[in-house]
From Swiss-Prot:
<protein>
    <recommendedName>
        <fullName>TATA box-binding protein-associated factor RNA polymerase I subunit B</fullName>
    </recommendedName>
</protein>
<feature type="binding site">
    <location>
        <position position="13"/>
    </location>
    <ligand>
        <name>Zn(2+)</name>
    </ligand>
</feature>
<feature type="region of interest" description="B-linker">
    <location>
        <begin position="69"/>
        <end position="73"/>
    </location>
</feature>
<keyword id="KW-0862">Zinc</keyword>
<feature type="zinc finger region" description="RRN7-type">
    <location>
        <begin position="4"/>
        <end position="39"/>
    </location>
</feature>
<keyword id="KW-0805">Transcription regulation</keyword>
<comment type="similarity">
    <text>Belongs to the RRN7/TAF1B family.</text>
</comment>
<dbReference type="Pfam" id="PF11781">
    <property type="entry name" value="Zn_ribbon_RRN7"/>
</dbReference>
<feature type="modified residue" description="N-acetylmethionine">
    <location>
        <position position="1"/>
    </location>
</feature>
<feature type="binding site">
    <location>
        <position position="16"/>
    </location>
    <ligand>
        <name>Zn(2+)</name>
    </ligand>
</feature>
<feature type="region of interest" description="C-terminal cyclin fold">
    <location>
        <begin position="263"/>
        <end position="373"/>
    </location>
</feature>
<comment type="subunit">
    <text>Interacts with FLNA (via N-terminus). Component of the transcription factor SL1/TIF-IB complex, composed of TBP and at least TAF1A, TAF1B, TAF1C and TAF1D. In the complex interacts directly with TBP, TAF1A and TAF1C. Interaction of the SL1/TIF-IB subunits with TBP excludes interaction of TBP with the transcription factor IID (TFIID) subunits. Interacts with TBP and RRN3. Part of Pol I pre-initiation complex (PIC), in which Pol I core assembles with RRN3 and promoter-bound UTBF and SL1/TIF-IB complex.</text>
</comment>
<keyword id="KW-0238">DNA-binding</keyword>
<feature type="region of interest" description="B-reader">
    <location>
        <begin position="40"/>
        <end position="68"/>
    </location>
</feature>
<dbReference type="GO" id="GO:0042790">
    <property type="term" value="P:nucleolar large rRNA transcription by RNA polymerase I"/>
</dbReference>
<dbReference type="InterPro" id="IPR048540">
    <property type="entry name" value="Rrn7_cyclin_N"/>
</dbReference>
<dbReference type="GO" id="GO:0070860">
    <property type="term" value="C:RNA polymerase I core factor complex"/>
</dbReference>
């Protein structure tokens, strides 16, 4: 920026009425007092001697190569905005409708910026320590429609190309109000962003600080609002498979957005997203934004337990007839009702449903109803099914639990091994190395070059196979077909071996049932129950481990959900135990 060349421009600033102009690298005049950029560019004295091509270039603004060492002036929230945009683009490529990015996520993000007083309000406060005078930008607290769009423009979002900026008839995005700050405040020694240092130190009560994990919370809330066919476990798995930017999301920042120092602690992620952690952040985000009641989850919606149960039954190669049993469990417990499935963050008793975990828990309960899973009955029923299948090879085969167990154990062990190898080979350091200051930059880049060189040399020595192309994302992790003899498909098998005719209805041959949790915890630890593997049968452990791996959740997390389903299904049993415990307490008192 050249201050001397801008002295000839003597008009007053429309924002602060000051006469102190500088010249941007694009050739436009900007106010050094309030940083307001005008549409006026430097005038040419004699246009007769200049060809038409140069006149067009001047009209667009004098394009000068900006020194990339300095980069753009940007705020931390703009970085998160860029990550959200990339994630929305990735979701759209996975088949999600464009309304999620252009409408739902767009409005959620605008609401966050307004609630956190970073934009879309009369007095935006960017930091708690630096005192700035913010000029009114003619914004109202409720009038969002009049504001420029944030997420529906080009991938640069708030950063438009210089060619677009010079056109007066094009409405360029301006996500943040104009700040009146001194020149020394426009650069940060300890971070690439303007407010990186202060953002990392900020601890304002009642304001939710944005983080990279919370971007996934925004994405899931948008998916839930649209009732899309992506569950939270699917979303986290797509992140793990690098179909959705997360770990190295900052790598997609424009080259001019310099990121170093304190920015590293804000945008760099060194762990995979955890289901429980992200679910808690979803509740935090929804509560902070004061979001209204979400659209109802009806029987036709993908997130309804009946549909999700069908999906997971196909996933784990269980018979199709089991869907009738899961539907009965859903109906008996009432977890398929619209009121139960509704997500209302601002309600007094807000219910938070883990739709995928709940559906899997229903299947576990159905398996216990049919096979008991006590390391005894399921094997006895398997012997009966095996004998029947040997005698009646032309008839519809009965479901053999032992054979299914052997097939699934082999399949899940292979899948786990590949998953663990992929995690072990994952490169946590991205292509763009992060550094703490400009002084460290050459050293960090040199080290990165050495690492890449060593990796190439090592790969040639061990003669490693070239990188396999990414598989297209799918909602299913297993594929079962009738033609595969090594991995037989059990979808068409019958449950006649475990059911019996009683009147006009079918009932289970097994009349017993054991509760996963006898007594629920009432302390303040927020855990309904505990899970110790040694206290449960091997069959039950295998079922929990199988579904826990599919959803990438802890086994104890699924066990807790199973216990809650059983509590709703067997209310009488739990009421009896509660009465007995209360009587024993009374006798102790007397």
């Amino acid at each position: 920026m050249d201050l001397e060349e801008a002295r000839e421009f003597r008009e007053r600033c429309s924002q602060c009425a000051a006469v102190s102009w500088g010249l941007t690298d694009e050739g436009k005049y900007y106010c050094t007092s309030c940083h307001n950029v005008t549409e006026r560019s430097r005038e040419v004295i004699d246009t007769g001697a200049i060809p038409n091509t140069k006149i067009q270039a001047i009209n667009r603004g004098l394009k000068r190569k900006r020194k990339l060492e300095k980069g753009w002036d940007w705020y931390v929230c703009e970085g998160f905005q860029h990550i959200l945009y990339q994630q929305a683009e990735a979701l759209q490529s996975l088949g999600v409708g464009p309304e999620l990015k252009n409408e739902v996520l767009h409005n959620f993000w605008k609401r966050y910026l307004q609630k956190s007083k970073q934009a879309y309000c009369k007095n935006p406060v960017y930091t708690s320590r630096r005192k700035t005078t913010v000029l009114e930008d003619n914004l109202s607290h409720s009038d969002w429609e009049s504001e420029p769009e944030l997420l529906s423009d080009m991938s640069c979002l708030s950063f438009a190309e210089s060619g677009a900026e010079s056109q007066p008839d094009v409405r360029t995005p301006k996500p943040f109000p104009i700040i009146k700050a001194s020149h020394s405040e426009t650069t940060s020694v300890c971070s690439g962003s303007l407010d990186g240092v202060e953002y990392s130190l900020r601890k304002e009560k009642g304001v939710m600080k944005m983080s990279v994990p919370r971007t996934l919370a925004f994405c899931y809330l948008s998916l839930l609002w649209q009732r899309e066919t992506i569950t939270l476990s699917d979303l986290l798995r797509f992140v793990e498979e690098e179909h959705i930017p997360y770990i190295h999301a900052f790598q997609h920042f424009p080259e001019e957005m310099k990121l170093y120092g304190r920015d590293k602690g804000i945008f760099a992620i060194e762990s995979w997203p955890n289901y429980e952690v992200i679910f808690k952040k979803i509740i935090e985000v929804a509560t902070f934004l004061d979001l209204p009641r979400f659209p109802d989850i009806t029987e036709n919606c993908y997130l309804h337990p009946n549909i999700l149960c069908m999906k997971y039954l196909m996933e784990v190669n269980l018979p199709d007839e089991m869907h009738n049993v899961t539907c009965l469990v859903v109906k008996s417990t009432g977890i398929g009702e619209v009121d139960f499935l509704r997500f209302d963050p601002i309600a007094k008793k807000a219910k938070t449903v883990k739709y995928d975990v709940q559906a899997v828990a229903v299947i576990v309960v159905a398996l216990k109803l049919l096979f008991l899973l006590d390391d005894n009955l399921e094997w006895s029923l398997s012997n009966i099914a095996k004998k029947y299948n040997e005698k009646n090879k032309e008839d519809k085969p009965w479901f053999d639990f032992r054979k299914w167990y052997q097939v699934m154990k082999k399949a899940i062990d292979e899948k786990k091994q590949k998953w663990e190898e992929a995690r072990a080979k994952f490169l946590w350091k991205g292509e763009k190395p992060l550094y703490y200051s400009a002084i460290d930059r050459p050293v960090v880049y040199k080290r990165r070059e050495m690492v890449v060189s060593l990796q190439k040399q090592f790969s040639t020595l061990v003669d490693s196979a070239p990188n396999v192309e990414k598989k297209k994302p799918s909602s299913f992790q297993f594929n079962w077909t009738e033609e595969d003899s090594e991995r037989p498909c059990f979808h068409g098998h019958s449950l006649q071996g475990v059911l019996q005719q009683k009147g006009q209805s079918l009932t289970t041959k097994n009349s017993l049932y054991w509760l996963s949790t006898q007594k629920f915890c009432k302390s303040h630890c927020k855990h309904v129950t505990t899970y110790e593997e040694s206290n449960f049968s091997l069959s039950y452990q295998f079922i929990l481990n199988l579904f826990s791996f599919l959803l990438r959740i802890k086994t104890s997390f699924l066990h807790e959900e199973v216990s809650l389903i059983e509590k709703r299904l067997f209310k009488a049993k739990y009421n009896k135990t509660n009465k007995k415990s209360s009587r024993s307490r009374k006798t102790r008192k007397y």
